[in-house]
Curated annotation (Swiss-Prot):
This is Neuraminidase. Glycans are attached at residues 44, 58, 73, 131, 220. One of its GO terms (molecular function) is peptidase activator activity. Substrate binds at residues 103, 137, 262-263, 278, 353. Keywords: Calcium, Disulfide bond, Glycoprotein, Glycosidase, Host cell membrane, Host membrane, Hydrolase, Membrane, Metal-binding, Signal-anchor, Transmembrane, Transmembrane helix, Virion. The influenza A genome consist of 8 RNA segments. Genetic variation of hemagglutinin and/or neuraminidase genes results in the emergence of new influenza strains. The mechanism of variation can be the result of point mutations or the result of genetic reassortment between segments of two different strains. It is an enzyme of class 3 (hydrolase). Residues 1-6 are intravirion. GO terms for cellular component: extracellular region; host cell plasma membrane; plasma membrane; virion membrane. It comes from Influenza A virus (strain A/Puerto Rico/8/1934 H1N1). Residues 36-75 are annotated as: Hypervariable stalk region. The gene is NA. Ca(2+) binds at residues 279, 283, 309, 329. The lineage of its organism: Viruses, Riboviria, Orthornavirae, Negarnaviricota, Polyploviricotina.
Amino acid sequence: MNPNQKIITIGSICLVVGLISLILQIGNIISIWISHSIQTGSQNHTGICNQNIITYKNSTWVKDTTSVILTGNSSLCPIRGWAIYSKDNSIRIGSKGDVFVIREPFISCSHLECRTFFLTQGALLNDKHSNGTVKDRSPYRALMSCPVGEAPSPYNSRFESVAWSASACHDGMGWLTIGISGPDNGAVAVLKYNGIITETIKSWRKKILRTQESECACVNGSCFTIMTDGPSDGLASYKIFKIEKGKVTKSIELNAPNSHYEECSCYPDTGKVMCVCRDNWHGSNRPWVSFDQNLDYQIGYICSGVFGDNPRPEDGTGSCGPVYVDGANGVKGFSYRYGNGVWIGRTKSHSSRHGFEMIWDPNGWTETDSKFSVRQDVVAMTDWSGYSGSFVQHPELTGLDCMRPCFWVELIRGRPKEKTIWTSASSISFCGVNSDTVDWSWPDGAELPFSIDK
């Protein structure tokens, strides 16, 4: 091949390569243009697609969080006894599982579910940080909640509020939580509605502001709670707060110079609120306060000679004022009023937190004798108990035409009565039924000490 032929051949090859490159570039440009056109077309239809997606998500959300107003206008359901509702076995499970060290558990229900609320100690059972958790008030305590009947663990629990004293309730539209924390001489109650801070209440007597350790009560969109500030062994200050969507709309201080109200157990009944409380000053029977939605109130003591506090004397002649015998100190408790009659929940022991029983005194709200017609045992005298409190299931949850009364019992284990480094509790609960029930004991059942205690 002569030089001219070589030049022509090389030139032809370059021309072909150039043409191929040009065709590829043109194809690339066309491809980009088509892709851009498709994206532009998609953007032009975004409103329709997104509208479909939003409609679907909104429909699902509404289905899961249907809002109602819990009116609280129903009367308590007629009942013959108490059926076991839940038992969490948290200390038994906590010997080998990740379970919170807690105290002061309580239950509250919305129109969709019931949850167990509790005050953690910022520690797990059988762990070094459980040491010293006998202490009531510390910066590590928090109000948390989990589905009723489940052992409270980091995996199923929801943080509610930093607190060493607390209450919570649902108005049908959202959860109200009240968490008190801070120093004894200046604690603050933080109110949250659906998890958002809405209000704070400062200690007004600077002597350990404290609240119910059980559910607040909601009526027609308003929720009501009672707080105490002042001595635990003398006259203190007691206030009722009316709260709407987390904001305090009204409050009053009780005029109760010879009464002592702590750790009240409250429930709605025919549009009003009834609270049965602890007298830690001088009463072995329980004080009560009843009020309407305007906070017009009445006060008194359960008259029955079947005494409800601990410590307490032998049953005998009661009083519609404080029964002073063995009246000092006390334990959180509850009762349910039915006209002149009353269901009284109490420890079986007169002097220690052992056992638990329900007593029906058909005239006990107004009469002072100690005659009763029903006794139902739920925790044996030989087993530990502790605090107890009321909660209700609204008709919007149960489908009944009345308010179902329920109660929970705290089963305290550990210090100061047992040889452990920790103090914690499990819980059981019962609801009133108008059918057959049974006497039995549903104890905590954990075998102590744990390995951390040895």
